[in-house]
Amino acid sequence: MLPGLEAAELPADAIEVGRIADAWGIKGWFKVLPYSADPEALFSARRWFLLPAEKGAKTFSGVAQLAIKEAKVHSDTVVASAQAVDDRTAAEALRGARIFVARSSFPSAEKDEYYWVDLIGLNVVNREGVAMGTVKELLSTGAQTVLVLEYSQDGKAQERMIPFVSVYIDEVDLPGHRILVDWQADF
């Protein structure tokens, strides 16, 4: 383990939100490549959990906890500073580390806004009560977000796409693990 990093357990609700790209400056700051266009989850979490890069990890192994002092947008990326990462050499040692934060530390979503991670795995049903599938992933097409559903037909895995816009989405029931849509099964 690198000096200053604490060994830790990955929280049960941990979500991978980015990775450390490189050192930034000489005072221990480092560049972060967030996986989201809105890095708000990175900014709200005071503790980040690091896993080594998937290949060639030489600096640390296992899960490490990092206490974040500050994180901010800089140009097209995010830069951050952490306790016990005091110089460029320490920051360089984190290069490639995968960043996880506890889902419980995300800021609350606004009304009728959802974190994609909360939608994955939900069952989708249309107004007629027909099961449309389970949310496998979401795609951003630029104009809108699209739900990618997975369902089985004749024993074969199939995919169906539904735009995630209010015209087609009647209700998102996170506690009920369900999305109600205005969409025909044969469309």
Swiss-Prot record:
Primary localization: cytoplasm
What the protein does comes down to:
An accessory protein needed during the final step in the assembly of 30S ribosomal subunit, possibly for assembly of the head region. Essential for efficient processing of 16S rRNA. May be needed both before and after RbfA during the maturation of 16S rRNA. It has affinity for free ribosomal 30S subunits but not for 70S ribosomes.
Recorded source organism is Albidiferax ferrireducens (strain ATCC BAA-621 / DSM 15236 / T118)
Q: Which HAMAP family match?
A: Ribosome_mat_RimM (MF_00014)
Q: Which family does it belong to?
A: Belongs to the RimM family.
The record describes its quaternary structure and partners as: Binds ribosomal protein uS19.
Mind telling me which PANTHER family this protein's record contains? Answer: RIBOSOME MATURATION FACTOR RIMM
Ordered alphabetically, the record's keywords are: Chaperone, Cytoplasm, Ribosome biogenesis, rRNA processing
Name the lineage: Bacteria, Pseudomonadati, Pseudomonadota, Betaproteobacteria, Burkholderiales
Protein name in the entry: Ribosome maturation factor RimM
Localization terms from the record = Cytoplasm
One GO BP on record is: ribosomal small subunit biogenesis
Q: Where is the PRC barrel domain?
A: 111-187
> What's the entry's take on its domains?
The PRC barrel domain binds ribosomal protein uS19.
> GO CC annotation: what is one?
cytoplasm
**What GO MF terms are annotated?**
ribosome binding
